[in-house]
């Protein structure tokens, strides 16, 4: 985790497919929940190779502004930057562009977890459901 430092940057691309869209009676456009998922996954992918074995990140905070529509079939690009590291908390700034303009801005936080510890905690909840 010592390799996770502010200033780490990356880019991800996605072609907007029907499953990323909503219509609301008009043309199919990139929907906000898909923009959130794209931002989260892109930030995860940026830092995942730098984590220790047995670690993973989970999203904890998302603040997003969806600024403009993007039609189905157009590519979108996420430009991510890790802007803050506070122990296990990672804060990112993400800008989302389509082929013509800035379409979204996101502030996102992820938390580095130990997979085994998180799994134990989850198993306790699953066991409690079975009672």
PLM segments and residue spans:
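Catalytic strand-loop segment that frames the active site of acyl-thioester-processing enzymes
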Residues: 1-31
């Amino acid at each position: 985790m010592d390799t996770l430092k502010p200033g780490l940057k990356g880019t991800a691309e996605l072609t907007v497919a029907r499953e990323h869209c909503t219509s609301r009676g008009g043309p199919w456009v990139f929907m906000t929940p898909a923009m959130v998922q794209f931002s989260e996954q892109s930030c995860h992918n940026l830092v995942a190779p730098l984590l220790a074995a047995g670690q993973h990140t989970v999203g904890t905070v998302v603040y997003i502004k969806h600024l403009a529509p993007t039609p189905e079939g157009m590519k979108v690009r996420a430009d991510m930057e890790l802007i803050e590291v506070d122990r296990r908390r990672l804060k990112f700034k993400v800008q989302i562009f389509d082929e013509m303009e800035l379409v979204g801005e996101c502030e996102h936080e992820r938390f580095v977890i130990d997979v085994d510890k998180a799994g134990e905690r989850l198993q306790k909840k699953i066991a409690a459901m079975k009672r």
